[in-house]
Amino acid sequence: MSQMLLSIKPQYVKEILSGNKKYEFRKFRCRDEIDTIIIYATSPIKEVVGEVSLIQIIEGDVEHVWNQTSPYGGVLKEDYQEYYKARDVAIAYQLGEVTRYDKPKKLLDFGLTYAPQSYAYI
């Protein structure tokens, strides 16, 4: 089992934890062996709040990935297009079973002294 910690904005964390957001969009693909994403909620929360299984990684043309994921992407099309502006390829992590921690954890619990800009392998 391999894990990575993702820094995610609080509004998207809320949607992931509620089960409404089934895809997390990124500009870079993680290692193939990753099967669990640790969820770090960025400022103002600044805590590790849960984890989610990674079902699959969808990679492809920006418009194609949008068409495949938009019903459960949790973002507006305008925001998606802005995020991938000047890019040809989009990455979507398909999220599975979500576990919300009873008590949020600190980054130090995962051997990290600061929040990663995007992700960190654990």
Language-model features, listed with the residues they occupy:
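Non-catalytic, usually N-terminal nucleic-acid engagement modules in DNA/RNA processing proteins
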Residues: 38
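Contiguous surface segments at macromolecular interaction interfaces
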Residues: 1-4, 8-33, 44-49, 57-122
